[in-house]
Regions:
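Compact nucleic-acid interaction/catalytic patches
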Residues: 21-27, 32-67
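C-terminal terminal-subdomain/extension
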Residues: 67-123
Length: 123
């Protein structure tokens, strides 16, 4: 098992993950938004990054521009409507970090999404 501890805001390459519908996904970038609060985490939680910038039009997608800090190859979006469980064994490496302001924006959008969803359920 890897002894690398990733931090909130790290952008990591994940070899295998599970979509919310149960289907398996492979080889994608994620922003780490939390861990399991263990001294040596066995899983992390993250939001998926997509290079399909045309999807920026959706309210839960947030654009991040490539820069020397995040090391993205192109401008991308973070999909802020779902948090993925990422086992540490599936994280291959870190490529960069997002700015704290971007991270806070992701969390704000996610919380707004949950509030809207809650209102629809109780309506």
């Amino acid at each position: 098992m890897k002894n690398i501890k990733y931090e909130i805001g790290d952008i990591v390459f994940v070899s295998k993950y599970e979509y919310d519908n149960g289907n398996e996904g492979q080889n994608h970038l994620f922003v780490i938004i939390s861990d399991d609060d263990q001294l040596v985490p066995i899983e992390y939680f993250g939001m998926i990054i997509s290079s399909h910038i045309e999807k920026e039009k959706y309210s839960t997608n947030v654009r991040i521009n490539k820069n020397a800090n995040n090391n993205l190859h192109k401008d991308s979006i973070v999909k802020c409507d779902y948090i993925y469980n990422i086992p540490v064994k599936n994280i291959q490496f870190k490529i960069g970090r997002v700015d704290i302001d971007d991270y806070l924006k992701f969390i704000e959008i996610y919380n707004e999404f949950l509030d809207d969803l809650s209102k629809k359920i109780t309506a």
